[in-house]
Amino acid sequence: MLVPTVIEQTSRGERAYDIYSRLLKDRIIMLSGEVNDQMANTIIAQLLFLDAQDSDKDISIYINSPGGSVTAGLAIMDTMNFIKSDVQTIAMGMAASMASVLLSAGTKGKRFALPNSTVLIHQPLGGAQGQQTEIEIAAREILKTRKRLNQILADNSGQTFEKLQADTDRDNYMTAQEAKDYGLIDDIMVNQPK
């Protein structure tokens, strides 16, 4: 993937940044693509760095992701909760699966979606192979993970655990307004006047 470069004028001349480094200077983190361990390590490092720089300023995470690894996503969420800085989450495009959990885990009152974004909640995906006992162990772990994710979504949205169990039984797509009504986000960011 080609990453654009931004040229800035400084007192010492010109300075070139890749676009993500430039956004990081403004305390903006981009969470895009599949949630995996490599992405999680990068996001966590950025969160820790920005919090160490100034824990009184908000950090914004823009989310456009189909989801991915539950353990990687929970590591990001735990770090969001661990740091002192408030974390603003903004869905743009798609916040699906684990990405919807991260969207809802932003600081209450600071969870947003752009008007045409989509939020998807569902049960975790998994598979198992091997001997019967190994399949049973894997199935129990998937059920435990589903219960944990539904409890997190219930806590973040204000919905009951039972409602989350029912609503995540199958893919549940939501518009930005539906995600707001459900409690996954606090508001919809409207277009700035031109």
Swiss-Prot record:
GO terms for cellular component: cytoplasm; endopeptidase Clp complex. Its EC number is 3.4.21.92. CDD domains: S14_ClpP_2. The active site is at residues 97, 122. Keywords: Cytoplasm, Hydrolase, Protease, Serine protease. It catalyses: Hydrolysis of proteins to small peptides in the presence of ATP and magnesium. alpha-casein is the usual test substrate. In the absence of ATP, only oligopeptides shorter than five residues are hydrolyzed (such as succinyl-Leu-Tyr-|-NHMec, and Leu-Tyr-Leu-|-Tyr-Trp, in which cleavage of the -Tyr-|-Leu- and -Tyr-|-Trp bonds also occurs). InterPro entries: ClpP (IPR001907), ClpP/crotonase-like_dom_sf (IPR029045), ClpP/TepA (IPR023562), ClpP_His_AS (IPR033135), ClpP_Ser_AS (IPR018215). It is found in: Cytoplasm. PROSITE patterns: CLP_PROTEASE_HIS, CLP_PROTEASE_SER. GO terms for biological process: protein quality control for misfolded or incompletely synthesized proteins. The keyword Cytoplasm applies. Fourteen ClpP subunits assemble into 2 heptameric rings which stack back to back to give a disk-like structure with a central cavity, resembling the structure of eukaryotic proteasomes. Belongs to the peptidase S14 family. Cleaves peptides in various proteins in a process that requires ATP hydrolysis. Has a chymotrypsin-like activity. Plays a major role in the degradation of misfolded proteins. This is ATP-dependent Clp protease proteolytic subunit. It comes from Latilactobacillus sakei subsp. sakei (strain 23K) (Lactobacillus sakei subsp. sakei). The lineage of its organism: Bacteria, Bacillati, Bacillota, Bacilli, Lactobacillales. The gene is clpP.
